[in-house]
Amino acid sequence: MQTAVSDFINAFASSCSDLLTRALRKRVVLQVEEMSSVPASDLSDTVLTAPAAVVKGPGCTIAVVLERQLAFSVLDTLLGGDGKTAVENRPFSDVEQAVAASFMEKLADCLNSIWRWGSDKDLVPDKMAEYFSESGFSAGKEMVFLAVLNVSWDKNWRKMYICIPDSDLDVLEGELKNAFDADGNVTLSVEMGSSSLDAGEARQLGIGDVVCVAPPEGGLMVRAGKKAFCLAQSGAVGDSVAASILCRYEGQDTGTPAVAALLGTAKRPWKEVLNLDTGDLLVLDRTRMSPVPLMVAGQLKAEGQVIVIDKRLGVRIKKLL
């Protein structure tokens, strides 16, 4: 069994190296080294063991964890930082844990798919690379991908490092830094108005409360994360609602409004979003005027009904999510 697992790891490592070298056009630094027998519980000081991606295979378990320094670097990058956060002697925050859980879940899904696929097929590098590219980490994924894979069987550990250099593509330094998901898509929110409430007031909102929202000058605001990209006006294309771009911002950081009322959302590849220009139509994937979705601190938290108070647009909260 140890030989079978070793063969699997070597095939997986080879496919990763081949695929990612082609995808990023850079040499992947990959090192496989032996590690003495260490119980998982003894690794807690140096790695992020919870959450972690666990892949169950026949006779062995693959536990995907992040070394502490790399964990802070990856989480800082995913949360909008520069990825240079130093190791800190503090627990990971709830937000960091949630981001790490999502990251690990996607990786675990990919590895599980490969394991199931490879259980009845030859694990040759070309086939592994082909399947790996179709399992959630497609070629062209532009992000810093730093991970440590710990593979255990019968109390023996083998540690594989996969450390990919920063992509030479400029997305990590561009306007959409960290705004895209694992598939390279950006969720754009089309706001019909935002409130002047501060964060503390927004957290106290409940059912029945009315939030007055002021529409931005010129139309609707199209936003990706904290970045405002353009003002738009709504219209229709067939049976779909669309936003027509009136003018374009250069991804200026406007901050996240405490409360924003949405006309709808659209998920688009980040390259397409970067190319949006005046006069373009952005067809919305989801539109809903009744009830109106309310974003609180950048997250969908409530739904409400549009009302008018003294000629001002407002939303009465009907449901908390």
Give, region by region, the residue ranges found by the protein language model.
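N-terminal auxiliary interaction/assembly segments of multi-subunit proteins
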Residues: 1-321
